[in-house]
């Protein structure tokens, strides 16, 4: 995920690397929560010495301005609410530089039943737009949609099979 960093001439004072690091981090944290890895990358990109950057990041972690665990937990819940499966959430957190233990804890807060229910909601929302297609085509498209959102193939087939069977039962009575 690219991180916007303010131009170097806006940073003051130019001679103190810790002050520059602090300014960069605070400006980035103003707009949204960031992982420690994202902030490290931004500092590296701006040429802040590693030791000065690490001291600032350590201090920000101490005071709670950087909390990868809280960010990962909130991100996992928000993304799951948008219909992403645990696997996709974990992949996005990895890309943001969150460590595996923290990712494991964050995705463990998403239980299987809520993941299944989210998949059902996605399928129910998409199914009406596929109404005129043959059931195998509907199934293929719905399974593909779920797999792209990180759901396992088995869960996707199960949810789609149930949804298409439910639609068939409703239309048989017409």
Specify the residue positions occupied by each region the protein language model found:
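An alpha-helical, amphipathic repeat domain used for nucleic-acid recognition
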Residues: 1-174
């Amino acid at each position: 995920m690219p991180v916007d960093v303010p131009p170097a001439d806006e940073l003051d004072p130019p001679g103190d690397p810790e002050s520059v690091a602090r300014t960069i981090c605070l400006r980035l944290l103003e707009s949204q929560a960031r992982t420690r890895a994202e902030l490290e990358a931004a500092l590296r990109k701006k040429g802040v010495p590693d030791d000065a950057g690490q001291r600032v990041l350590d201090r920000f972690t101490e005071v709670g301005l950087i909390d990868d665990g809280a960010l990962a937990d909130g991100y996992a819940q928000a993304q799951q609410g948008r219909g992403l499966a645990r696997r996709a959430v974990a992949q996005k957190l990895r890309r943001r530089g969150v460590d595996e233990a923290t990712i494991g804890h964050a995705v463990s807060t998403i239980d299987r039943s809520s993941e299944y229910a989210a998949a059902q909601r996605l399928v129910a929302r998409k199914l009406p737009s596929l109404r005129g297609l043959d059931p195998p085509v509907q199934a293929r498209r719905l399974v593909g949609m779920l797999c792209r959102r990180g759901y396992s193939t088995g869960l996707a087939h199960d949810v789609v099979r149930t949804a298409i069977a439910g639609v068939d039962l409703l239309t048989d009575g017409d």
